[in-house]
């Protein structure tokens, strides 16, 4: 039976290949004297894709040809809308948008001429030829589709060809379906590609177990269900690992309609057979199932079957010893979609690579390769919108121009920041370590996208922001890490309008020390901040990230060397004075970070105590000596 089928279909296929070789396949004619490259292309909604199958050891290069015959190298270019994807042992894919460079529109069709080169490892060009991509494709009744044009290497060897028996595949209106007519490239859901020559003798045409295509039940129950071609008894003899078929109803009719096997005596009555099964679902999913039996028949490895254009994330959803299953959305995994009249056509490719075994003096393979072109066709008129999305045009870009920024630094009376000191209240007197609540704000601005940024804040002994010594309060917008009393940033409450126009922090009152004598400077401390305004747009968030690490150090006067860079500096209306806990300005001597100055009175007491004891002991000794001397003198007189 299989031999008869192969003989029956051998003559038409051979005739078709001969006609293609003689000249009808005008797009895929190789250069004289050079073997051709196997390739095919597809047309999508927004662009076209060229699929080229190199031989082992070949590297593909693409060039586009303009209307004057000039060739231009192809690289991944977002300006020209050209993209190339190439991986070892897999087809190379060249994609071009209809808006791309050198794509010409003639008579409502898009034309792109592509020059392909297969380069050997030594840099020599092994194969070179042109291909013209035309989208939408011309009428297949007048022009042979490139997917069936045979490469020149057909005449050199006897490759194993994967061919499919024709089946009746026309469904009723409104169903997702596939048309299994391999000799009609315009409607075929499977376009077999010749495999690599396999070792040993074999027939020129090897008949693949017939693939079946199923459809899901209609939404309209009054319409007649399409009854697909049933699998043969041999195809339903699955030895082990029966895989349940995806059907809505478990009836025999629904199972066979889906292209699956049915046996009510089994635990799994509806299961996939020993073939390739394609299912198209109205909820927007592809199901592709390939059996191990089919893989063995055509000398391919089941584990090497994958989606041609898919990323690595589109791996099989289920892989057993007997089957491999791909389940993915129609719009994912490299699926192309095009609109033909009132029909939506989704297409994808299943391909198989080869397993290479490397030896000490060479490499071999025992695998053939094949590709399975799957197609789902839906009637667009049957679909109703389930969601409408409105994308308003982007807001016009803000007009920017240079100008002054009005800023203000003021000191609040308490931590609530509800009232502030006026100019007549300065200088403000604070005890050492007492908190000072500081606010910097942007004035006369109502743009909510403006963000006030604090870069550096510091204290100085005069109204000159650059006078030394200085003490840093904020560094790069974050509390200065060298301060043992870390400055605290204060969040704004929700009632403050334009919160991004404000920055608040609390600093502990301090006294600047003279860098030479390390004694407290008698005077006032003025507060300064360098600021800028940032406009949030796109990826610019205008935020400052501060680390949470702490380092306790003694306050000492710092030195700023930022004066070379222009800055917007804002200062407090007046200075902050300080006094000790007794109401007097302290005159401190040198101290260390452990507060040893507070231990000095105790140290003096400890040192003076032995001296006092020594003086008292000496006095007692002198007194006793005089007493004993007088008593001795009186006793001698008597």
UniProtKB/Swiss-Prot annotation:
Residues 554-638 form a propeptide. Residues 165-175 have a biased composition (Polar residues). Proteolytically cleaved before the transmembrane segment to yield the secreted ectodomain incorporated in the zona pellucida. O-glycosylated. Glycans are attached at residues 76, 379, 561, 596. It is found in: Cell membrane. Residues 623-638 are cytoplasmic. CDD domains: Trefoil. InterPro entries: P_trefoil_CS (IPR017957), P_trefoil_dom (IPR000519), P_trefoil_dom_sf (IPR044913), Zona_Pellucida_Domain_gp (IPR051148), ZP-C (IPR055355), ZP-C_dom (IPR042235), ZP-N (IPR055356), ZP1/4_Ig-like (IPR054554). It is a single-pass type I membrane protein. Component of the zona pellucida, an extracellular matrix surrounding oocytes which mediates sperm binding, induction of the acrosome reaction and prevents post-fertilization polyspermy. The zona pellucida is composed of 3 to 4 glycoproteins, ZP1, ZP2, ZP3, and ZP4. ZP1 ensures the structural integrity of the zona pellucida. This is Zona pellucida sperm-binding protein 1. The chain crosses the membrane at residues 602-622. The keyword Glycoprotein applies. Keywords: Cell membrane, Cleavage on pair of basic residues, Disulfide bond, Extracellular matrix, Fertilization, Glycoprotein, Membrane, Secreted, Signal, Transmembrane, Transmembrane helix. Disulfide bonds join 236-261, 245-260, 255-270, 457-478. Residues 1-25 form the signal peptide. Residues 26-601 are extracellular. Residues 234-274 form the P-type domain. One of its GO terms (molecular function) is structural constituent of egg coat. Belongs to the ZP domain family. ZPB subfamily. It comes from the Eukaryota.
């Amino acid at each position: 039976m299989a031999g008869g089928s192969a003989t029956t279909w051998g003559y038409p296929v051979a005739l078709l290949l001969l006609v293609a070789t003689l000249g009808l396949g005008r797009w895929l004619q190789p250069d004289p004297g050079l073997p051709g490259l196997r390739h095919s292309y597809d047309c999508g909604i927004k662009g076209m894709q060229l699929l080229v199958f190199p031989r082992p050891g070949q590297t593909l290069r693409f060039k586009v040809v303009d209307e004057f015959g000039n060739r231009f190298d192809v690289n991944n270019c977002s300006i020209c809308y050209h993209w190339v994807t190439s991986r070892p042992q897999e087809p190379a894919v060249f994609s071009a948008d209809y808006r791309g460079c050198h794509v010409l529109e003639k008579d409502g069709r898009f034309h792109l001429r592509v020059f392909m080169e297969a380069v050997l490892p030594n840099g020599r060009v092994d194969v070179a030829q042109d291909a013209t991509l035309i989208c939408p494709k011309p009428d297949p009744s007048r022009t042979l589709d490139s997917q069936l044009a045979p490469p020149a290497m057909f005449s050199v060897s006897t490759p194993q060809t994967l061919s499919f028996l024709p089946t009746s595949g026309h469904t009723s209106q409104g169903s997702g379906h596939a048309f299994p007519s391999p000799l009609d490239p315009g409607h075929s859901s499977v376009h077999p590609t010749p495999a690599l020559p396999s070792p040993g003798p074999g027939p020129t045409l090897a008949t693949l177990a017939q693939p079946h295509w199923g459809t899901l039940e209609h939404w309209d129950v009054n319409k007649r269900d399409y009854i697909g071609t049933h699998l043969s008894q041999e195809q339903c003899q699955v030895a082990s690992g029966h895989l349940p078929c995806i059907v809505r109803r478990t009836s025999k009719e629904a199972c066979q309609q889906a292209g699956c096997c049915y046996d009510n005596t089994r635990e799994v009555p509806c299961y996939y057979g020993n073939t390739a099964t394609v299912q198209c679902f109205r909820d927007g999913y592809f199901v592709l199932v390939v059996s191990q039996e089919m893989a063995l028949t055509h000398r391919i490895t089941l584990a090497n079957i994958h989606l041609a254009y898919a990323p690595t994330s589109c791996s099989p959803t289920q892989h057993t010893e007997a089957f491999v299953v791909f389940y993915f959305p129609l719009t994912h995994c490299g699926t192309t979609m095009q609109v033909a009249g009132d029909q939506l056509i989704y297409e994808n490719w299943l391909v198989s690579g080869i397993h290479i075994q490397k030896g000490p003096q060479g490499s071999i393979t025992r695998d053939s390769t094949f590709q399975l072109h799957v197609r789902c066709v839906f009637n667009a008129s049957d679909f109703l919108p389930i969601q409408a999305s409105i994308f308003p045009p982007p807001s016009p870009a803000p007009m920017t121009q240079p100008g002054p920024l009005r800023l203000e630094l003021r000191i609040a009376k308490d931590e609530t920041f509800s009232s502030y000191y006026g100019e007549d209240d300065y200088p403000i007197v604070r005890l050492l370590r007492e908190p000072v609540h500081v606010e910097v704000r942007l004035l006369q601005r109502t743009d909510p996208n403006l963000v006030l940024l604090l870069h550096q804040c510091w204290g100085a002994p005069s109204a000159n922001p650059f006078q030394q010594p200085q003490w840093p309060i904020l560094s790069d917008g974050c509390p200065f890490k060298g301060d043992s009393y870390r400055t605290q940033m204060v969040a704004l409450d929700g009632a403050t309008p334009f919160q991004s126009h404000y920055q608040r922090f609390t600093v502990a009152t301090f006294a600047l020390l003279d860098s030479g004598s390390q004694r407290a400077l008698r005077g006032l401390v003025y507060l300064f901040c360098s600021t800028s305004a940032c406009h949030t747009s796109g990826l610019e968030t205008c935020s400052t990230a501060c680390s949470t690490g702490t380092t306790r150090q003694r306050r000492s006067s710092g030195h700023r060397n930022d004066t070379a860079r222009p800055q917007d500096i804002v200062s407090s209306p007046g200075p902050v004075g300080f006094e000790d806990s007794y109401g007097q300005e302290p005159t401190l001597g040198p101290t260390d970070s452990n507060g040893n100055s507070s231990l000095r009175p105790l140290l003096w007491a400890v040192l003076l105590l032995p001296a006092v004891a020594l003086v008292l002991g000496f006095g007692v000794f002198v007194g006793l000596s005089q007493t004993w001397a007088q008593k001795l003198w009186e006793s001698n007189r008597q």
